[in-house]
Amino acid sequence: MIDDTLLEAEEKMEKATNVARENFAAIRTGRANPALFSKITVEYYGTPTPLNQLASFTVADARLIVIHPYDKGSLRAIEKAIRDSDLGVNPTDDGSVIRVAIPPLTEERRRDYIKMARHEAEEARVAIRNIRRHAKDALDKLQKDGEVGEDDVRRAEKELDELTHKYVAHIDEMLKHKEAELLEV
C-alpha cells in the first residue's frame, strides 16, 4: 500500500515535469523550433484543429521554419492562425509551403519570456508539492486506519521528500537552461 502511494506520487510528479518541459518548449527563444507552434489551433473546415495535425515542419536554418501543409486548401487558414497567434512572427506562403522567419528577440521581449518561464517553473513546483501533500495525506490515512505502522510511514515520508526534492531540482535545472537559452544573443 505504501509502495503504491509512492509509485503513484512519482508518476504524477513525472507528468508534472513533462508538462513543464512542454510549456518551456513553447516559449520562443529567437531560434527556429517547431515546438513554438504546438499550442496553435487552426479553424479547419469549421473545426479547431492543432496545427501539428495539419502540417509537417522543417527547420531550414537557425531562424527559418518551413511548414508543409498536408492539404494545400488549409494554407490560408494555417497562415492566418500563425499570424493571429501571440508569437510575433510574420508567415509568408508561396502557394505550397509557409515560411516563418523567426526575428531576433529584443531585450524587453527576452525579459518577458524569462518571466513567463519562471512562472511556468513555479506552477510546476507547486504542482509537485501538491502531489507530495496528497501522498502524505494518503500515508497518514493508512496509518490512522491501522493498516501500516508509524515507522513505515516515516520511512515512506522520507522517500516522498527525496522524490519531491529530485523533481523540484529537475524543474529548476530546466528553468536554468531555458533562461540561458533566452539570454543567448
Swiss-Prot record:
Record key words, sorted: Cytoplasm, Protein biosynthesis
CDD domains associated with the record: RRF
Set out the biological process GO terms recorded for this chain's protein: translational termination
GO CC terms of this entry:
cytoplasm
Asked whether the keyword Protein biosynthesis is assigned, the reply is yes
One Pfam short name = RRF
Name where it's found: Cytoplasm
Q: Which domain of life does this protein belong to?
A: Bacteria
| GO molecular function (one) | ribosomal large subunit binding
Matching entries from PANTHER family are given as: MITOCHONDRIAL RIBOSOME RECYCLING FACTOR PSEUDO 1, RIBOSOME RECYCLING FACTOR
Summary of the function given for this chain in its UniProt record: Responsible for the release of ribosomes from messenger RNA at the termination of protein biosynthesis. May increase the efficiency of translation by recycling ribosomes from one round of translation to another.
Describe the family membership recorded for this protein in Swiss-Prot or TrEMBL: Belongs to the RRF family.
Entries under HAMAP family matching the protein? RRF
Protein name (record): Ribosome-recycling factor
**Native species of this protein?**
Acidothermus cellulolyticus (strain ATCC 43068 / DSM 8971 / 11B)
Gene name of this polypeptide: frr
